[in-house]
A protein has these predicted regions:
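Conserved micro-motifs of the catalytic ATP-binding
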Residues: 4-9, 48-51
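Conserved catalytic submotifs in the C-terminal HATPase_c
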Residues: 10-12, 32, 37-47, 95
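A conserved beta-strand-to-alpha-helix junction within the catalytic ATP-binding
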Residues: 10-25
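Short beta-strand/loop element within the Bergerat-fold HATPase_c
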Residues: 74-86
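Glycine-rich/acidic phosphate-handling loop/turn and adjacent ATP-lid/helix
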Residues: 90-108
Length: 152
């Protein structure tokens, strides 16, 4: 899947709040079941995003999987969701496990996530310090479409 060729991404409009609630929520539940503490800072989101739901889920699943491999379970995972200036941002930060042991990694997962986000018109930024790892996803956001007959 990784390479120069484009992925077969099919963008569709989604209510960002509903999609994030479901997809991010699934990852949070999985991590909590593994003993992680999640600290959420979720601002009210009222926008529409264009994503390929299956590929977006793949990005979020990869992040949750990486956290379960590399994050220190004794420290909280921070999840921030914000909507500002025409963009939706999801930021996930964790403390790095000091001795992860024998964990296979070729970092292809993160590169694929970056490619998926770029093809969906967004960004995937990762930052690592000595003890923290942070990923920030951004997607262009549009106002929610008002259904016919609805008033704001």
């Amino acid at each position: 899947v990784f390479g120069a060729q484009e992925l077969p991404i099919q963008l569709e409009p989604f209510d960002a709040a509903a999609l994030l609630d479901q997809m991010v929520g699934e990852g949070i539940v999985m991590l909590e079941q593994k003993g992680y503490t999640i600290r959420r800072a979720v601002q009210p989101v009222s926008c529409q995003i264009q994503v390929d739901a299956s590929y977006f889920k793949r990005v979020l699943d990869n992040l949750a999987d990486n956290i379960s491999k590399y994050a220190d379970p004794a420290k909280p995972i921070y999840v921030l969701v914000a909507q500002e200036s025409g963009a939706l941002t999801l930021c996930v930060s964790n403390t790095i496990l000091k001795n992860p042991g024998q964990v296979e990694s070729n970092r292809i997962g993160l590169r694929i996530c970056e490619k998926i986000m770029r093809q969906m018109g967004g960004t995937f930024e990762k930052r690592q310090t000595e003890d923290t790892f942070t990923v920030t996803l951004t997607l262009p956001a549009q106002p929610l479409a008002v259904e016919e007959g609805e008033t704001s």
